[in-house]
């Protein structure tokens, strides 16, 4: 049995192929999938901004916590099951790995359906809690009242793609998300401008795209999968859920923290904006735009992390620590280069970036450009924290993964958003961003260096 396990490890390219080529193979599809997934929100924001205006942009920002919370459920189950699958396959436990994948797949469908029902039942109080103003609420209700219908498919496609990548089919994973986003992009202008449906048209375009992506996920696992999976494995098992939650919790908590920050920020902007020359709606709309722009950057960094995830997990399970360390260094370097490019764009071209999302008054552009420059000041260092969270999760260090996920959003940014505006008004929200980013970066470097040092020592003593 031990010889069979060693043979399986030796045959798997995750343990033998050059790290650079492996990261390219897995990261590029993951990056494209993450970017395309982000486009579901960004494309809507662009067309809504052009067709509906500032209040439409504000409405999508108020509705955005629903998407973030749904993403949290998808990552909890998708990353949790994929991480466990990779670890068990690396250790040669194929049957156990498949059982975990089956539980993850079925619970993705169940959780998405539950979320859809909850949002539709409590739509108005949720949107008010998320920071809706009287002028913005009608648009937000129209938008999220429709997009909630597609949540089961969104959760399935977002989480299921992690399992497909773990099943060594990164290209198909990319195609699933790409197909849905392409349909969304085509239907957005048709529904918004051609049919004159406004923000409702953007919502229906999003739902149809999500349904297509979800159906492609179902087709893969019913016809094209490489992993062994029978119907009995689709019945959720408590022991599998425990393992999935353990390794998926870091990414889930990170998304929940993002949602919490978004909600607190919206309400803070609503309150302090009303006390400023900008009013409430301009800051909320601008914050939504900057949030969507940041999604593009984070999609690339998280895509690199997700592409590295199976390499980290397999080699850690196989005790090939030098490959784990090499993969981490390569990924961090790549992410930092990309982050620096985004930093330059944010600092030198804020007007052009904001202008993509529609026209507005001089006051609107003044606030948006200032917000983008200040809040995103530490972009060049922002990729290390989410990458380290994914790294610790992939090697089975769930507790450290959770800590890394919480540092920026909960430990630093959330309290700063509450405290700074008391002293600096609405500008305090902007300055909270770079201070939180710097603090999270330092903490991530400390934890990662310590873990890599432990691996190096274990390798030398082996």
Per-segment meaning from a language model:
Residues 69-72, 184-188, 214-218, 296, ...:
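Hydrophobic transmembrane alpha-helices of multi-pass small-molecule transporters
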